[in-house]
């Protein structure tokens, strides 16, 4: 029915970045999207849900994250962070917004986002990359997981140390993709 088709279409479109990561030899999700639209799913509804649904608080958190943007490896790596307490004060923030913007910047190969929970001593690391860099290797190194272009890990530690270790690992990954085993 239309409701189920819509929910499934939302998932397909969200999972592959609204077709930003489609390879010409792997187009099955395009066919699935076609079928879901045929059975009543509305891609415009999905787009509005994903891209036109932010609150003022979300935009303020996004501005904070962009204001902290840091570049490494001649602009090939971008990173930023937010603290859990900031989320509680300003409002929630979905890192997908951050990744949509940072991965669209010319020359960027890897974007990394840190969510820091100082109270629990935990840091959530999220990675995104272009198709030629396998960030799941970095996530696996920290005990996390994911797939080639989107991965993450939870790690205990002091933020400045975790950040430097992460960025060094990503610089190594850029220089030699085989330097980190997956």
Give each language-model segment a name:
Residues 3-9, 13-141, 146-182:
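Hydrophobic helix-and-loop "lid/oligomerization" segment in the mid-to-C-terminal part
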């Amino acid at each position: 029915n239309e409701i189920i088709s819509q929910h499934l279409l939302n998932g397909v479109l969200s999972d592959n970045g609204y077709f930003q990561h489609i390879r010409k030899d792997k187009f099955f999700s395009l066919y699935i999207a076609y079928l879901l639209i045929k059975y009543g799913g509305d891609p415009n509804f999905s787009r509005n849900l994903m891209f036109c649904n932010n609150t003022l608080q979300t935009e303020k958190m996004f501005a904070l994250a962009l204001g902290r943007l840091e570049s490494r490896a001649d602009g090939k790596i971008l990173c930023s962070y937010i603290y859990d307490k900031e989320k509680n004060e300003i409002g929630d923030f979905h890192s997908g917004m951050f990744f949509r913007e940072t991965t669209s910047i010319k020359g960027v190969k890897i974007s990394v986002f840190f969510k820091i929970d100082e109270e629990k001593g935990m840091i959530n690391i999220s990675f995104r990359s272009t198709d030629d860099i396998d960030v799941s290797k970095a996530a696996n190194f920290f005990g996390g997981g994911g797939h080639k272009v989107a991965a993450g890990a939870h790690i205990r530690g002091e933020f400045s140390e975790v950040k430097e270790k992460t960025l060094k690992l990503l610089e190594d990954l850029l220089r030699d993709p085989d330097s980190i085993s997956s």
